[in-house]
Amino acid sequence: MTIYHFVGIKGTGMSALAQVLHDMKCVVQGSDYDKRFFTQEALEARGIPIFPFSAQNIRENMVVIAGNAFPDTHEEIVAARELGVPVIRYHQFLGDFLQKFTSIAVTGAHGKTSTTGLLAHVMQGAKPTSYLIGDGSGKGREGSEYFVFEACEYRRHFLAYSPDYAIMTNIDFDHPDYFANIEDVFSAFQQMAWQVKKGIIACGDDEYLQKIQAKVPVVFYGFGEDNDFQARNIVKTPEGTSFDVFVRHTFFASFHIPRYGDHNVLNALAVIALCHYEGIDVNIIQERLKTFPGVKRRFHEKMLGSQVLIDDYAHHPTEIRATIEAARQKYPERQIVAIFQPHTYTRTQTFLDEFAESLSLADAVYLCDIFSSAREHQGKLSIEDLRAKIEGAKLLDEEQVDVLKQHDNAVLIFMGAGDIQKFQEKYEQSVHV
């Protein structure tokens, strides 16, 4: 009996893949650091064992799936090679695995996770569908016809995939520790486009995606007149967003989503276009769009006394802007307070002015110290460099979070890709004391 052992099982993609294999009746286990991570809940709910890192975890009857954050010198990977146990990197394993299904990759600088989650939710209403989402969620269904998965451009990992379809949400300059500039990012997406086997659904409002070439049909969606799928007559309320969809200038149907901001209309349009292409009944699409519960760490709301607390993964200026605008749509009468933890020195340095500009859309700004990634050690700048560019911005220390209590009846948005959640947790504890 083969055991699939995940080195770094708490990673968002790794956790999701482990869940998919477990659901498909594979024997799964993994190892990681002791520190608690939000992906653990789903693993623990399935009874998937999680061990501390140790060479002793590796046995001969295993296939080792290695997370991208761990080098070949990691003790478990070394032990596996010494035993002659296969070691497969996450994206390579996934690339082979998805060949069993009609596969749909969702990629783009922003909106990948929300769009993957939404597509999986809608498709499940029509066909047996398995999915892997970048928020750490995965679901495997035996006999699945479709496999919906998030494909990340970082280090060109998505080139390990040759999907049947690709949804491309946008192209933007991110991951400056790897990509040289926007042209470098575009070249990665162009390489990915050549590998798609049936069709590409791309946002036609994005100037770079308009230039994408492919061997398969490219269907464009967006707000602009030239798109194959166009959203018109958009109505935004505190309850959500309604819009009409026109397919090549002919009315198709009306839709409502309990979501906020233009970016969520675009995400829904991408899903509508893909489902239309695959012949899924419009009534199913309409109903499923209304019932989408959202994905983890994307505009996740909770009430705390008179305040609304929102947890969001936004870590790029474009995402911060979209999140603040979404909060304004839902809570037009409330003060919007941004609490932001920059993620990586490289990204903070590269987008310093853009971060200042997007955060300034909030009514008040608090900044937490820069969270450095496993890939970097230290940077030349400090959080003070960003604070100096935002009028009235204050630095927030984990031990002084109760200063947020002064924002009565406000919306507090905790944003970042590091461990910003610990600030929110500390604040919630301080309120309950």
Swiss-Prot record:
Enzyme nomenclature, EC number: 6.3.2.8
InterPro entries in the record: Mur-like_cat_sf, Mur_ligase_C, Mur_ligase_C_dom_sf, Mur_ligase_cen, Mur_ligase_N, MurCDEF_pg_biosynth, UDP-N-AcMur_Ala_ligase_MurC
Gene: murC
Compartment(s) of residence: Cytoplasm
Highest taxon above the source species: Bacteria
Residues binding ATP: 108-114
GO BP annotation list: cell division; cell wall organization; peptidoglycan biosynthetic process; regulation of cell shape
GO molecular function, one term: ATP binding
Protein name per its UniProtKB record: UDP-N-acetylmuramate--L-alanine ligase
Reaction catalysis annotation: UDP-N-acetyl-alpha-D-muramate + L-alanine + ATP = UDP-N-acetyl-alpha-D-muramoyl-L-alanine + ADP + phosphate + H(+)
PANTHER family: UDP-N-ACETYLMURAMATE--L-ALANINE LIGASE, UDP-N-ACETYLMURAMATE--L-ALANINE LIGASE-RELATED
The entry's keywords: ATP-binding, Cell cycle, Cell division, Cell shape, Cell wall biogenesis/degradation, Cytoplasm, Ligase, Nucleotide-binding, Peptidoglycan synthesis
Cross-referenced SUPFAM superfamilies: MurCD N-terminal domain, MurD-like peptide ligases, catalytic domain, MurD-like peptide ligases, peptide-binding domain
Organism field: Anoxybacillus flavithermus (strain DSM 21510 / WK1)
Reported function: Cell wall formation.
Gene Ontology CC: cytoplasm
NCBIfam families: murC
Pfam families tied to this protein: Mur_ligase, Mur_ligase_C, Mur_ligase_M
Family: Belongs to the MurCDEF family.
Pathway: Cell wall biogenesis; peptidoglycan biosynthesis
Keyword Transport: no
